[in-house]
Amino acid sequence: MASAGAAYAQASDAPASAAPAGGTSLSPADQQFIQDASQSDATEIAASKVALKNSRDPRVKKFAQQMITDHTKLARSMAAITAKMRVPAAPAADSALVGKLQTLKGQQFDEAYVEQIGVEAHQRAVDLFQQQSQSGTDSQLKAAAARALPIIQHHLEMAKQLAGTMKGSSS
């Protein structure tokens, strides 16, 4: 499939480390946060679109639709901030992970999606956004991370609950 990020952002060909042209000068850590957050959103959106096709579990489909809605909003918010800074947030999904999920169907898919995207990816995102909200040097990015953090933490809790109910119903 095509890049997941293409659905909500046309990626620039500029390298990730490009300095803003006349915009705010960002620290390398802030630039890395932009790239990591953008990839996280793109991966979750792409994987969740696969979930809508490959899952047969209505709970997984409901979770996936919520991830698409929320991460699209988060991605647009990040793109608006980075556009003002003239920093390219060229989101590209983790194609290896999304590609692996595309090969699975039914319960195998559901378990892999909930564990790898629902729990593991959201745990990484919580860590990323927590770090940025506490230690970021750019005030706009710190504030954006702080605003997004409760949403991502809620997603992690939803995923853990879903994983628990799936384990309970499959044994």
Model-assigned labels for residue ranges:
Residues 3-171:
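His/Met- and acidic-residue-enriched segments that coordinate or traffic transition-metal cofactors
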